C-alpha cells in the first residue's frame, strides 16, 4: 500500500470538487490530492446522454479561474438570442483542460482517476491492484450529493408487457423500432427527452409524458449573464417573492409577475426542480397532450398493453404502482 500525504483530500473530480480545488490553488498554498472513480474529470457528465446540454448559460458553470465557452449568443435553434449552452463533450473537455493545464502543472495537485475511495484516507485503483493510504489535514467529500444518472442505475420500477426500458443514452440509437415513447419524470432530463424526440420529428401523439405532478419552470431568458437579466430577475422573482406570506403565495406571485413558467396554464404546479427552458422550448413541450400523472409507492409495478413501447427514465423518475 502506497503512503501519501497532503493538506486536502478531495473525493470526486466533478464540478464541485474541481471548483473547490481551483479556489484553494488560487487563494492558498495548500497541497491537494483528488480521487475520482471516473477516467477523467467531469463527474456525472462522463455518464450523461450524448445530446445533453447545460440548462443554464455556460458562463455560469465551471471553475472561477477559467471561463467555460466563448461567451457567445446562439443565433439558431430553440435557444436563439440567448447565451450558449455547453454540450456534454464541451463540459468534459473543459474540466480535463483545467486539470491538465492548471492543476497538475502547479505541482500542488495529485490526481488519481479510476480509483474507488473506501474512506479513512484509503482508496484503490479500479484497473490494477494498487492501494493507497493518505495522511491528510482535511477531507472534502464533493460527491456528497450522490448524483446518479439513469445510465448508471436500473429504473426504479418494474415493467410487464411488451416494454423496453432504456436510459436516454440509448435514445439516439433506437431509430424507428417503437410505436410509442413513454417519458418518465418531470425534471431536466425528461424535458431533454421530449425535446429530442420532437426535434427529430417524432409525432407528439406517439409520446406520453408520465410525471408525478406538474412542475414550475424557470425562464432561461431571465437567467443570463447581463445586467438586464439581473434587473428582470429582481422585478419578476425577488420583489414578488419577498412580498409573499407562504410558499403557495410565493409561487403564485412570482408566476403572475412572469418569473416562472408552466407547461399547462390550467394546472397549478406543486413541484419545483429548477428546470430551465426558453419560451420557444415551452411551446414545443406544450405539443405533448398525453400527460399521465402517477401515484408514488414503494413497490412499483407498471403494465402496458400489447403495442411495443419504449420507456425512457430520467433522474426525476419516481417509482409508482398505477397510473391515474
Residue spans of the language-model regions?
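Glycine-rich FAD pyrophosphate-binding loop
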Residues: 26-47, 209-215
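Beta1/beta-strand and adjacent pyrophosphate-binding region of the FAD-binding site
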Residues: 4-16, 179-184
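Internal nucleotide-binding/catalytic subdomain
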Residues: 249-274, 280-283, 289-295
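Glycine-rich active-site loop/strand segments that organize a redox cofactor
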Residues: 43-93, 214-264
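N-terminal Rossmann-like FAD-binding beta1-loop-alpha1 element of flavoenzymes
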Residues: 8-30, 193-197
Amino acid at each position: 500500500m502506497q503512503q501519501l500525504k497532503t493538506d486536502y483530500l478531495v473525493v470526486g473530480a466533478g464540478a464541485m470538487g474541481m471548483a473547490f480545488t481551483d479556489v484553494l490553488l488560487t487563494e492558498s498554498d495548500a497541497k491537494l490530492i483528488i480521487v475520482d472513480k471516473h477516467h477523467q474529470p467531469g463527474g456525472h457528465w462522463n455518464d450523461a446522454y450524448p445530446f445533453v446540454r447545460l440548462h443554464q448559460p455556460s458562463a455560469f458553470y465551471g471553475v472561477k479561474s477559467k471561463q467555460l465557452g466563448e461567451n457567445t449568443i446562439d443565433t439558431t435553434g430553440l435557444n436563439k438570442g440567448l447565451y450558449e449552452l455547453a454540450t456534454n463533450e464541451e463540459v468534459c473537455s473543459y474540466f480535463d483542460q483545467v486539470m491538465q493545464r492548471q492543476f497538475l502543472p502547479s505541482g500542488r495537485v495529485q490526481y488519481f482517476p479510476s480509483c474507488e475511495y473506501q474512506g479513512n484516507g484509503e482508496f484503490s485503483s479500479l484497473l490494477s491492484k494498487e492501494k493507497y493510504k493518505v495522511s491528510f489535514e482535511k477531507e472534502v467529500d464533493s460527491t456528497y450529493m450522490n448524483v446518479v444518472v439513469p445510465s448508471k442505475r436500473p429504473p426504479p420500477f418494474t415493467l410487464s408487457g411488451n416494454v423496453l426500458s432504456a436510459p436516454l443514452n440509448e435514445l439516439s440509437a433506437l431509430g424507428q423500432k417503437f410505436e410509442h415513447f413513454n417519458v418518465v419524470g418531470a425534471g431536466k432530463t425528461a424535458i431533454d427527452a421530449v425535446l429530442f424526440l420532437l426535434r427529430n420529428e417524432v409525432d407528439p401523439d406517439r409520446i406520453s409524458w408520465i410525471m408525478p405532478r406538474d412542475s414550475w419552470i424557470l425562464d432561461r431568458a431571465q437567467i443570463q449573464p447581463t445586467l438586464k437579466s439581473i434587473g428582470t430577475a429582481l422585478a419578476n422573482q425577488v420583489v414578488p417573492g419577498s412580498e409573499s406570506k407562504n410558499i403557495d403565495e410565493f409561487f403564485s406571485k412570482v408566476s403572475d409577475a412572469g418569473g416562472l413558467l408552466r407547461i399547462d396554464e390550467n394546472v397549478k404546479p406543486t413541484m419545483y426542480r429548477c428546470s430551465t427552458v426558453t419560451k420557444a422550448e415551452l411551446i414545443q413541450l406544450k405539443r405533448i397532450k398525453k400527460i399521465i400523472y402517477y401515484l408514488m409507492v414503494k413497490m412499483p409495478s407498471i403494465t402496458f398493453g400489447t403495442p411495443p413501447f419504449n420507456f425512457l427514465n430520467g433522474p426525476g423518475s419516481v417509482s409508482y404502482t398505477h397510473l391515474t
